[in-house]
Amino acid sequence: MVHWADYVADKIIRERGEKDRYVVESGITPSGYVHVGNFRELFTAYIVGHALRDKGYEVRHIHMWDDYDRFRKVPRNVPPEWKEYLGMPVSEVPDPWGCHDSYAEHFMEKFEREVKELGIEVEFLYASELYKRGEYSEEIRKAFEGKEKIMEILNKYREIAKQPPLPENWWPAMVYCPEHRKEAEIIEWDGEWKVKYRCPEGHEGWVDIRSGNVKLRWRVDWPMRWAHFDVDFEPAGKDHLAAGSSYDTGKEIIKAIYGKEAPMSLMYEFVGIKGEKGKMSGSKGNVILLSDLYEVLEPGLVRFIYARHRPNKEIRIDLGMGLLNLYDEFDKVERIYFGVEDAKGDVEELKRTYELSNPRIPNRLIAQAPFRFLAVLVQMPHLDEDGIISVLTNQGHVPKELEREDIERIRLRIRLAKNWVEKYAPDSVKFSILPEPPKIEIDESVREAMEEVAKWIESKSTFSVDELNNVLFEVAKKRGISSKEWFSTLYKLFIGKERGPRLASFLASLDKDFVVRRLRLEG
């Protein structure tokens, strides 16, 4: 089965024709924190570009920061005094936290760093800079010249939606007052380069379209941008792709005003966190950022989450127990890719998903420390990172001979597992080793079984987890002790709970003398 990104890439080539270079675009308004839902737009453009590159084409991936949009409302996490900046470009609103040159830069810079950590190369462009240096001047003038046609297109869709037509004094652009920097209404155009405006403060004047103070309205700005950069593909959320929305009007405006065809698009669905209700909003502050995911996920897994889901399918990221399954799934796909494990089903699609979720694929399988087991080991106070690596090698989870890349990856996973246990793990997964044996009633046959296990461990200089597991089952079976009674007693003895991690692996990870003493109720 063909991966969805390859399917889209093939469709772009068919519909846009053979080119030496294709342009893919994504874009976001930095009105608040750029969250994992926003990232889906950039990643969808990126992965389709990746597929085009793999077919031998040059690709330019533009990510447009719409930082020349108005500051529309004061978010909850911003001081109410910021209402005085409403109507100004977000790129000119001061940073409330005082660490960046502007409100917009505060959010853009963080997201750009997060994207870089994923190894994704993208060309970030800033609408404020493009407008201010006059790069769009010719296209803005064309929009003024085609005002009547644009109104006709927009009114056609407004009528279908049973909305009133645009007023006769509507213009396809707005002005930022050079004096107050607030949005001003246009009241006249001289037919050339000058526009007359009136700002909310009552100030009137003329500005030159080439001065950078005139900005196209969204439904005109978007198709103008497609034409200016010759965009071949840009994904969009379903609000932009609904019937009569900005994509529909944009398709007609780009053709009527700029004489070009609209790029191909693809609708992407919502991204949320399992268990959280409602839609994330960067301006409301109820968001999960890429940097939040980096606290518990390797970069490859973040990319994998988005690569394996078709864009029209909703993603619910499970940061609870489902995260352990995600690591298991990713590790399995990675092993299949490197031929270490056989696969059932469509092997090629699995391999392609792995390829597309990695900008730079290693030349061999880097050691995979099982995250599920790491979540146990990081809770053992006697084990530091080196101790954990020793347990992993002794129990055969990773090779005994480790290279630098292997050790780096294992150490990263150890840190991620610690973070997961602290922040997201349910109580059923958490435990602590009891410093002293608890005072619990233990049946005589269970005591005998405990002593037999203690003697067996004492007699061995080394042993495998499987050997210990067999002993644990045998000593209970020959005494007629039920598995439930036997295992719950041992868990209570070590962690004070009736359930816990896989017992043999757990006991084998503890200090041998400590296990023997505890089984004898000595300490």
Curated annotation (Swiss-Prot):
A motif ('HIGH' region) lies at residues 30-38. It catalyses: tRNA(Lys) + L-lysine + ATP = L-lysyl-tRNA(Lys) + AMP + diphosphate. The keyword Aminoacyl-tRNA synthetase applies. Coiled coil: none annotated. It is found in: Cytoplasm. A motif ('KMSKS' region) lies at residues 279-283. Zn(2+) 2 binds at residues 177, 180, 199, 203. This is Lysine--tRNA ligase. It comes from Pyrococcus abyssi (strain GE5 / Orsay).
